[in-house]
């Protein structure tokens, strides 16, 4: 693998790795997912370590959410208990990092409308992590902290209102909280 590859889903190594994982999982291509993804997995892990260790400017777009999604996919697909525990701890560390380092714009409405609103995408990923059973108590506390901030901002654009309502219903359904 060459150096200086992007770690984003839409135009980077993480998207390629998720695509390869999909092809292997559904038998479009033959092979062992751990063997095929070994180099990419190592590269993403090193990139994640660099991202987590370095302080960046507040306006810098980091691939932490994309890396988190990649490791959730790997966690679901892996069978070895040691790797599963490793990915579980890494997932927990990544979502805590994202939550702790969120910016002021995390709760602000996006103009123009965007499907990739970080706060909503993060909530959907938290629900996904909650469903697979990683750090459910911590995620419950995060959701309780986010709830008042999220519902105190009333989106002006109808599409943003609909997106907020949809994400809130999804969260409420999967964590069994009727207040959402």
Give residue spans per PLM region.
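Glycan-recognition and catalytic cores of secretory/periplasmic carbohydrate-active enzymes
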Residues: 1-180
């Amino acid at each position: 693998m060459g150096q200086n590859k992007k770690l984003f889903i839409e135009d980077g190594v993480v998207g390629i790795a998720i695509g390869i994982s999909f092809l292997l999982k559904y038998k479009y291509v033959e092979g062992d997912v751990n063997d095929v993804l070994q180099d990419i997995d190592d590269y993403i892990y090193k990139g994640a370590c660099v991202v987590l260790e370095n302080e960046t400017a507040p306006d810098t777009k980091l691939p932490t959410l994309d890396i988190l999604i990649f490791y959730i996919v790997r966690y679901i697909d892996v069978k070895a208990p040691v790797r599963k525990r490793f990915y579980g701890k890494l997932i927990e560390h990544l979502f805590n990092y994202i939550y702790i380092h969120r910016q002021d714009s995390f709760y602000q409405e996006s103009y123009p409308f965007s499907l990739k609103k970080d706060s909503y995408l993060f909530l959907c990923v938290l629900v996904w992590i909650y469903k697979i059973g990683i750090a459910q108590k911590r995620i419950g506390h995060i959701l309780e902290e986010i709830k008042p901030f999220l519902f105190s901002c009333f989106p002006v654009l109808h599409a943003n209102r609909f997106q907020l309502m949809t994400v809130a219903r999804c969260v409420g359904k999967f964590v069994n909280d009727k207040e959402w």
